[in-house]
């Protein structure tokens, strides 16, 4: 009898997990309305997948709008251009350390230390505009800490 209840509990937990997976959309784009809490959770998921786990081909199509607007002077707008750019980052030779992040009123930001083999570390800030569930616009600024810096405070 005890194994019967254990089997029922196992199947119930498996069904709950499968339902949770099925309720998560394949993509958050095109944009759909989202509460502030939903938007925060979606942004946290994007940071984890794209920045921390460096799973670009999974994260970018899920979180970036096809008509994504890019303000970086060295990159063109569009989701595919983001994927092409991120393909240059080898996860084995670049490390992104999230220092701070936040989201408020459809604006999200992240401050990170970026270390790439053969280069000095960078302080890197990304700013995004979200439309509901979807990232639709980006600004980014990065800078190395110069060797002759006079400010003793750390960059990151």
Task: Describe the residue ranges of each PLM region.
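C-terminal and inter-domain tail/linker signature
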Residues: 5, 14-156
């Amino acid at each position: 009898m005890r194994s019967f209840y254990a089997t029922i509990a196992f199947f119930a937990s498996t069904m709950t997990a499968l339902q949770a997976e099925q309720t998560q959309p394949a993509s958050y784009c095109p944009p759909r309305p989202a509460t502030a809490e939903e938007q925060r959770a979606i942004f946290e998921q994007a940071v984890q997948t794209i920045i921390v786990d460096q799973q670009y081909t999974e994260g970018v199509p899920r979180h970036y709008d096809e008509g994504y607007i890019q303000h970086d002077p060295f990159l063109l707008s569009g989701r595919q251009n983001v994927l092409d750019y991120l393909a240059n980052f080898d996860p084995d030779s670049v490390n992104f350390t999230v220092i701070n992040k936040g989201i408020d009123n459809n604006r999200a930001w992240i401050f990170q230390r970026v270390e790439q083999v053969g280069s000095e570390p960078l302080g890197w800030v990304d700013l995004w505009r979200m439309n509901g569930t979807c990232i639709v616009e980006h600004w980014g600024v990065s800078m190395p800490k110069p060797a002759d810096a006079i400010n003793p405070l750390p960059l990151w």
